[in-house]
Swiss-Prot record:
Keywords: Ribonucleoprotein, Ribosomal protein, RNA-binding, rRNA-binding. One of its GO terms (molecular function) is rRNA binding. GO terms for cellular component: cytosolic small ribosomal subunit. PANTHER family: 30S/40S RIBOSOMAL PROTEIN S3, SMALL RIBOSOMAL SUBUNIT PROTEIN US3C. Part of the 30S ribosomal subunit. Forms a tight complex with proteins S10 and S14. HAMAP family: Ribosomal_uS3_B (MF_01309_B). Belongs to the universal ribosomal protein uS3 family. It comes from Pseudomonas syringae pv. tomato (strain ATCC BAA-871 / DC3000). It comes from the Bacteria. GO terms for biological process: translation. Transmembrane segments: none annotated. This is Small ribosomal subunit protein uS3. Binds the lower part of the 30S subunit head. Binds mRNA in the 70S ribosome, positioning it for translation. SMART domains: KH. The gene is rpsC.
Amino acid sequence: MGQKVHPIGIRLGIVKEHTSVWYADGRTYADYLFADLKVREYLQDKLKSASVSRIDIHRPAQTARITIHTARPGIVIGKKGEDVEKLRQDLTKQMGVPVHINIEEIRKPELDGMLVAQSVAQQLERRVMFRRAMKRAVQNAMRIGAKGIKIQVSGRLGGAEIARTEWYREGRVPLHTLRADIDYANYEAHTTYGVIGVKVWIFKGEVIGGRQEELKPQAPAPRKKAAK
């Protein structure tokens, strides 16, 4: 059977960057790794309704800089910045070093793999038909400018006795092209029938020479002059 590598892991250092950036020797590496895991679990639990896509952690010189990528920055910041300050204090206590929090707004949530997966999962939990949820997400992504998108759901779809896998795709999703900028994410929908897994692949274009490929309208062909 075919073995499928993680679409983001294979592109690290090519078109994707690490979400944790720090250096540690053998004695502290495991401690830093475990601390990052706990920080992400804490933030994802606290910010469930904030549409958080990604959490980047940098550790420069006895400090920590955490960047939260969210489609709803107002929920993270809170009234007059009270919520983000409470988060900073809790994370400083948890990590044992001064923490700085940056918030990056996601302008196009329809093109973010994690947010699309969360949206489909939430619709499945509200008992929306899985085909309708997938088709709606695919159409929104293609309308915004995606070059291709694939969504796959697995589990007891529609309350069926036997679990199965269904998928829907539009455009092209070149998983074997390393320069292809593919955003991949997976999420779980907890329904009354059990857990349904949601996977999303979004192809945004190819990165050539460190620059994102841009869609340019084709120039009209020159008109031929009529012979006199």
